């Protein structure tokens, strides 16, 4: 009874928050008159995912004037998950959106618990055209539910002008190891006072990037067994992170906004992140021509390491019991799985790295980008994506990472990595069994 009461109370709270004037949610609409007559989409990031959905709405309505109106709502990633899970658990289907974006780290948890609530798209989407690691992420129990969107391919983006002040050239930034990256970073900081990158103690994407570049994750390939204590790639990632801190190569930030403002304001010399960060880098047009992109550094002394990885990335999912599931499936598959002209538009306007194996079908594939000194950024990132190791993210990435963050902070004070990883292993095993 108590659980039921709590669930009802939570539902009321969420529904009230969704309509409250002070909500964090920002709604933009393509000529929406009635919510009930609109295809409703929830996504995050106005410069990337939500912008892509709005552009898709514009293109689709031009081709299909009689199609339903399309409403795009910007919410935070966590907010989308919590709201949708609560609505599904309570079967309040009339409040559901038709389409949601889910980050690749989260999707297995969602599909394990709510598989029957999503539209399987095997007969609508040609999944063979997507890179293997992205295709596998949208599968569950032999069916495919998502339309892969951005790759999340990791890359090293750097300010050539800042590095040149320290005596380094574009050639010096090719085929880096992590030790060489840190050597360059030390000299850059000594000569310019600019740290090499941002580090956020409350978020560990860099650890994920390094770990996956070695073909490992927080869980084994079965997606369930916690793989912490004997995970050499994780240990190496944490050692690299620690060394970056000890050598003062990282600027401490807290959260997304500080991360973005640091490189937009020229406070760091490089960014190691996913290709989706391109749209944020290019927001500051005064820096056009100053940026370059290259492969991530290679982890030394690990025979499985490659200079390629992934961070984040997402796909579109259609809710089966929403008001307009069928027409939403028509819209999403046409725009995001079939229309190569529209994908060209996204490459040009938001800098997406599509999840396609073969980008030569896109006219914009070899386009050069003056912002990056004439580099063919899409082609480069696609070449990186082709060798990203495939790992099983499982369904507990963020839960295990929360444990790791807490214990790693203690390790930085106590200096005992073995003890740290042992504690994380024990706690992660408990989480993995839930």
Go through each PLM region and give its residues.
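Short, low-complexity disordered leader/linker segments with a strong preference
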Residues: 1-40, 62, 426-434
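Hinge/lid segment of periplasmic solute-binding proteins
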Residues: 101-155, 180-184, 209-214, 292-296, ...
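Mature extracytoplasmic/periplasmic domains
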Residues: 33, 52, 116, 277-279, ...
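Extracytoplasmic/periplasmic substrate-recognition and gating elements
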Residues: 62, 66-71, 89, 166, ...
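Extracytoplasmic "Venus flytrap"/periplasmic binding protein-like
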Residues: 65-132, 165-167, 269-270
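Glycine-centered hinge/linker elements that transmit conformational signals in sensory
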Residues: 182-187, 223-253, 296
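A structural signal for short loop-to-beta-strand junctions that line the ligand-binding cleft
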Residues: 86-89, 95-98, 122-163, 184, ...
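Extracytoplasmic/periplasmic solute-binding protein
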Residues: 145-149, 154, 179-226, 233, ...
């Amino acid at each position: 009874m108590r659980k039921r009461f709590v669930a009802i109370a939570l539902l009321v709270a969420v529904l009230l928050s969704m309509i409250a004037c002070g909500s964090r949610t920002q709604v933009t609409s393509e000529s929406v008159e009635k919510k009930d007559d609109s295809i409703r989409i929830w996504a995050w990031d106005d410069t990337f995912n939500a912008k892509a959905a709005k552009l898709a709405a514009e293109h689709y309505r031009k081709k299909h004037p009689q199609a339903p109106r399309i409403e795009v709502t910007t919410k935070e990633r966590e907010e989308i998950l919590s709201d949708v899970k609560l609505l599904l658990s309570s079967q309040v289907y009339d409040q559901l959106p038709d389409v949601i974006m889910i980050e690749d780290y989260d999707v297995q948890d969602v599909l394990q618990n709510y598989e029957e609530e999503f539209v399987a798209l095997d007969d609508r989407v040609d999944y063979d055209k997507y890179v293997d690691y992205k295709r596998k992420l949208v599968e569950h129990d032999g069916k495919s539910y998502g339309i892969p969107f951005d790759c999340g391919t990791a890359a090293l983006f750097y300010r050539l002008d800042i590095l040149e002040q320290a005596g380094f050239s574009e050639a010096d930034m090719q085929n880096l190891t992590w030790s060489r990256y840190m050597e360059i970073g030390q000299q850059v900081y000594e000569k310019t006072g600019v740290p090499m990158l941002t580090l956020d103690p409350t978020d560990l994407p860099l650890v994920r990037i390094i770990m996956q570049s070695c073909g490992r994750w927080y869980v084994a390939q079965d997606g369930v067994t916690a793989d912490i204590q004997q995970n050499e790639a994780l240990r190496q990632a944490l050692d690299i992170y620690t060394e970056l801190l000890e050598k003062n190569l990282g600027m401490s930030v807290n959260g997304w906004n500080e991360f973005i403002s640091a490189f937009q304001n020229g406070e760091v010399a490089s960014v190691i992140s996913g290709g989706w960060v391109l749209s944020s880098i290019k927001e500051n047009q005064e820096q056009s021509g100053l940026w370059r992109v290259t492969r991530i550094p290679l982890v030394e002394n690990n025979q499985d390491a490659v200079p390629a990885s992934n961070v984040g990335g997402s796909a579109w999912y259609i809710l089966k019991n929403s008001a307009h599931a069928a027409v939403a499936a028509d819209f999403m598959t046409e725009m995001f799985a079939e229309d190569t002209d529209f994908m060209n538009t996204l490459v040009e306007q938001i800098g997406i790295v599509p999840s396609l194996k073969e980008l030569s079908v896109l006219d914009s594939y070899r386009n050069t980008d003056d912002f990056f000194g004439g580099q063919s950024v899409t082609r480069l990132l696609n070449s990186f994506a082709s060798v990203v190791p495939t790992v099983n993210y499982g369904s507990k990435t963020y839960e295990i990472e929360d444990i790791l963050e807490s214990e790693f902070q203690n390790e930085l004070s106590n200096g005992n990595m073995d003890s740290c990883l042992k504690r994380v292993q024990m706690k992660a095993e408990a989480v993995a069994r839930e």
